[in-house]
């Protein structure tokens, strides 16, 4: 697949890049993408939830009232799960939600995600650019010129660029990162992917 390279003004530079078919034209494995995305989202969970059992709630655990003669159901402890202020049965406990996915499956998932975006025509290649200062307007103008101002966009740079990343931080629908850091979830969660030209080479080195 070939794509025309655009400048930051949104016009064609006359240059054409050829996308690597092993990465952007691969067979799409929905199952690999499912496993990787499920793992990414699960690994974000803190797992610090906690409910106290009857052994942990406050109180001495005395018998709340005598066994017979009150008309109430018998109770043996103020910490019983049946009492107000008592412990919780089978409540949530701290745990790790981490899910391991093999490296080959992760790479297959990323290739599948990029191939799906390429087939959908949601990949844009722009010439490499730099910003002189941290400022939102230049990045917003680039998105507008590319016709992506209203779309959830993933912008990939060859290396982490602090100035570009912080310039785009105030744009809610924009996510900026280096190409090698883009996960399957980042790719699938976007409506368009903007590659700086050098970022294509970077991702080919990572996934090739």
Curated annotation (Swiss-Prot):
The keyword Magnesium does not apply. InterPro entries: Ribosomal_uL4, Ribosomal_uL4-like, Ribosomal_uL4_dom_sf. Residues 69-80 have a biased composition (Polar residues). Gene3D superfamilies: 3.40.1370.10. GO terms for biological process: translation. Residues 46-84 are annotated as: Disordered. It comes from the Bacteria. Keywords: Ribonucleoprotein, Ribosomal protein, RNA-binding, rRNA-binding. One of its GO terms (cellular component) is ribosome. Belongs to the universal ribosomal protein uL4 family. One of the primary rRNA binding proteins, this protein initially binds near the 5'-end of the 23S rRNA. It is important during the early stages of 50S assembly. It makes multiple contacts with different domains of the 23S rRNA in the assembled 50S subunit and ribosome. Forms part of the polypeptide exit tunnel. Part of the 50S ribosomal subunit. This is Large ribosomal subunit protein uL4. It comes from Chlorobium limicola (strain DSM 245 / NBRC 103803 / 6330). The gene is rplD.
